[in-house]
A protein has these predicted regions:
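Post-DEXD/H (motif II) to motif III coupling segment of the RecA-like Helicase ATP-binding lobe
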Residues: 1-3
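Non-catalytic, charged helical/coil tracts that couple and regulate nucleotide-powered enzyme cores
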Residues: 5-6, 10-14
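Conserved Helicase C-terminal RecA-like lobe
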Residues: 13-37, 50-171
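Cytochrome P450 catalytic domain signature, combining two hallmark sequence patches
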Residues: 41-48
Length: 171
């Protein structure tokens, strides 16, 4: 695949310098417990696979283990076996994000929110709807890419939810 990469200095010199803030978020007790259970199970599975196939042929199992651990850190509902009664309060990351979004919107800010997991964007979308916060969303399944971009650019909505894959394709 061809990827076009341009630097901000080449296309938008008027934009201020990028500000990065790293905010550490604690896992909830349920996330911590599930993470440890999954970590131990995946550790065993990965070691067994490496013993059977060798390191070079075990990459899929290793990547699957990392993916599932990342999902636990985002929200337990991203796992297939998650209990149905879980809410945003059961996710340290989602709870913190929602607090941050409300504060940013309260300051009149606008937010581009990227996620690799479209299922995480769906959870965020549900929470925004429940709070009456407007947003636009762009994922690989969005047929009309122009409308959500224009909604956000026109200031109609303060939040733009974007999947990394869709957002990297010509925005």
């Amino acid at each position: 695949p061809f990827v076009l990469r341009r630097k901000k200095e080449q296309v938008a010199r008027e934009l201020p310098p990028k500000t990065e803030i790293t905010q550490w978020v604690e896992l909830t007790p349920a996330q911590r417990d599930r993470y440890e259970i999954l970590r131990l199970a995946m550790d065993r599975k990965v070691r067994e696979e490496i013993t059977r196939q060798g390191l070079a042929r075990s990459q899929i199992v290793i990547l699957e283990a990392l993916l599932r651990l990342r999902q636990v850190c985002c929200d337990l509902r991203l796992l297939d076996e998650a209990p149905a009664e879980l809410t945003s309060a059961d996710s340290g990351k989602l709870s913190s994000l929602l607090d941050m979004l409300e504060a940013l919107i309260g300051e009149g800010r606008r937010v581009l929110l990227f996620s690799q997991f479209t299922s995480m964007l769906t959870l965020i979308e549900s929470e925004l709807q429940a709070r009456g916060i407007g947003y636009a969303k762009l994922t690989g399944s969005t047929r009309d890419r122009r409308t959500p971009v224009e909604q956000f650019q026109a200031g109609e909505v303060p939040i733009f939810l974007i999947s990394l894959k869709a957002g990297g394709a010509g925005l």
